[in-house]
């Protein structure tokens, strides 16, 4: 299928208003956590569509409440500390990955964080602009630049989790 996008204002106008408060106070609100937990694919689980939702937190304290939530709703999820609020592993260092299947932490699929001093940094672009990022992603997709190990580990963790869900 093709990627789809729906503005949060159309999905839930009150949540959109709460998210907009960030631009007034300069901080994310609990509304950002609620928005991250929205999972449009869960509605298709009855039809056999399986997904492992990537749930990220910015502050370590949120890991506890999100763990409680994922257990309560019996989620299939990968919980991790995100990068700049996004649900992607830091390209410089692998964060801890906690995998939940049916709300239970799966130790065999979860991964410990990379600790200690970084001795080598991945070859990343010099800027953060859209054009620079797009060019870098194209290079990675073509294989002319390597995918950072931490992001490859996140992808592997998700594939292994989906395979575990699909197993009889």
Residue ranges and their predicted role:
Residues 1-168:
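Glycine-rich anion-binding loops and their surrounding alpha/beta cores
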């Amino acid at each position: 299928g093709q990627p789809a996008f729906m503005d949060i204002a159309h999905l839930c106008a009150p949540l959109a208003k709460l998210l907009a408060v960030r631009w007034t106070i300069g901080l994310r609100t609990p509304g950002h956590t609620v928005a991250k937990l929205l999972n449009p694919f869960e509605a298709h689980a009855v039809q056999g569509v399986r997904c492992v939702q990537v749930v990220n937190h910015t502050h370590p304290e949120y890991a506890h409440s999100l763990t409680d939530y994922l257990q309560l709703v019996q989620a299939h999820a990968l919980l991790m500390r995100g990068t700049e609020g996004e649900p992607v592993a830091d390209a410089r260092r692998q964060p801890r990955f906690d995998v939940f299947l049916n709300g239970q932490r799966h130790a065999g699929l979860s991964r410990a964080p990379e600790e200690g001093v970084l001795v080598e940094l991945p070859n990343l672009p010099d800027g953060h602009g859209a054009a620079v990022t797009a060019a870098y992603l194209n290079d990675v997709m073509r294989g002319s630049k390597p995918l950072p190990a931490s992001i490859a580990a996140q992808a592997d963790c998700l594939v292994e989790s989906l395979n575990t869900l699909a197993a009889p």
